[in-house]
Design a protein with these regions (language model features):
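Extracytoplasmic small-molecule ligand-binding "clamshell" domains
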Residues: 20-94
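Periplasmic-binding protein-like
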Residues: 28-31, 113-123, 192-235, 253-271
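Ligand-binding clefts/hinges and TM-proximal coupling segments of bilobed small-molecule sensing domains
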Residues: 58, 150-160, 233-271
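A ligand-binding cleft/hinge motif common to bilobed small-molecule-binding domains
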Residues: 84, 92-104, 178-211
Length: 271
């Protein structure tokens, strides 16, 4: 009986130790508003902290060095190889679909979409034009070489090329542009560094599918149970409003997952 009790205790302790294993999350060192090691802030860092708490596991950030100016979707270098090699358990804010963001990485898989991100339209206070189709022949500031810039060309806007989200938003104050079309999370980071009172989100603007993406957690494909647990935690955090509050704290415009997202077909619909 004593040996049986000892065995049960050992099993219980082993189970407890396993449950307490840290949740390792790969985060880029300089990637505001998602993660910033120096300030200890960022939407992905806050999300990771909340998910780990829901799972009853301590959070272990795995910081990955990167350039300091990566703020656009097109420029992000997600540390997918580190995830595949087991350096961490999950990445957050990975855009779908997997055939694009995880191309050449069959050992990885995306979880459920838990929020959407898009190019957002900023204008001056009282602006009533609220769709891309109303921007033909209108001066619009946009960061060069982005999907947003291509979309503006399709609708016939007068493009005012900028080198950063902050510069695009600044062109409203200098009257070089009537609008700025900026990747939403990048706008949040730029406005946190340099507030632009002249740049306000355009009321009633709905991002077109061509300029919208859904964001997912990414795990190793074999970690099905972990992926399901993370999806469940993210659904609960969204239902409670915690994700929305974390996004707002970083200046990220909040969107529930979109029904339709970027594709070449959706881009053609802008014409």
């Amino acid at each position: 009986m004593k040996s049986a009790g000892t065995a049960c205790l050992a099993l219980a302790l082993a189970a407890g130790a396993q449950a307490a294993e840290p949740l390792k999350v790969c985060l880029l060192t300089h990637n505001a508003p998602y993660s910033d090691r120096a300030s200890g802030r960022g939407f992905d860092l806050a999300t990771a902290t909340a998910v780990a708490a829901r799972l009853g596991r301590p959070l272990e950030p795995v910081w990955v060095s990167n350039g300091e100016k990566i703020t656009e979707l097109e420029d992000s270098d997600f540390p997918t190889r580190r995830l595949a090699k087991g350096a961490c358990d999950v990445l957050f804010s990975v855009p779908g679909p997997a055939r694009d963001s995880l191309r050449g990485m069959p050992q990885l898989s995306l979880g459920e979409a838990y929020y959407g991100a898009a190019f957002e339209l900023y204008g001056k206070a009282g602006e009533t034009r609220n769709s891309l189709r109303q921007l033909r022949d209108v001066p619009v500031a946009v960061q060069a070489a982005t999907v947003g810039a291509f979309g503006l060309r399709l609708v016939g806007a007068k493009i005012r090329t900028s080198l950063s989200a902050g510069e695009a938003l600044g062109k409203l104050a200098s009257n070089e542009a009537d609008f700025a079309l900026v990747w939403g999370p990048a706008a949040g980071a730029a406005l946190a560094l340099s507030p632009q009172p002249a740049a306000v989100p355009v009321a009633q603007y709905t991002p077109p599918a061509a300029l919208s993406w859904n964001e997912h957690p990414a795990t190793r494909a074999t970690d099905e149970a972990l992926r399901a647990d993370i999806d469940k935690a993210l659904r609960a955090l969204s239902a409670s409003g915690e994700l929305q509050a974390a996004a707002k704290a970083q200046g990220i415009p909040w969107h529930a997952p979109f029904a339709a997202t970027y594709s070449l077909g959706e881009m053609n619909n802008l014409r």
